[in-house]
Amino acid sequence: MFDETQEKIMNAAMELIMEKGYGSATTREIAVRAGVNECTLFRKFAGKKDIVLSAMTMPAWNPQLKESDFRWTGDLTEDLTNFSRVYMQKVTPRMVQVSIGLQSPELFEETAPGILQIPMTCKNVLREYFAKMGEKGIIRSRDYEGMAVQFLAMNFGFVFFKASFGNRLTATEQEDYIRGSVERFVDGIG
């Protein structure tokens, strides 16, 4: 789909956006980081916005999370643990940094649907799962939407903190966080 030069340009652009934000990353800096002439950049792409929108289609810059990524066994703890693992495997601190960098007013209208697709997929998957577990009498609450958003926020929060602060806020390892948070969540809804 993209040639090697285009990929270098897209990767350079996204790295700069993570570091500086969309508005502060210039096409000149992108070209230098990619190791190409700025004229080459404009032969390959219409401009910075085109580079970003193209990069958002690449697996390196889009977690491409789908409903089929999640497998359910019917065991609340096991299922939510697996959900968290898949979520954190795909929605990495790097992806969060890119999402933050792309929330620029001049780009937001074009990038928001792609960025929103990931949490919407997760929320819908969780809501449907909680509804099934509610029908089976495994969970008490019937606020499936609320539970889905809370569980998603718990996972996103951890990834966001790691993206923003590394281990400076908490040295808790991902797997320890998943086990502990799932255990507390299940205790609260079970």
Go through the PLM ranges and name each one.
Residues 134-183:
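Hydrophobic/aromatic-rich alpha-helical bundle segments in the mid-to-C-terminal region
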Residues 1-20, 24-39, 43, 50:
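Basic, helix-initiating cap at the start of DNA-binding domains
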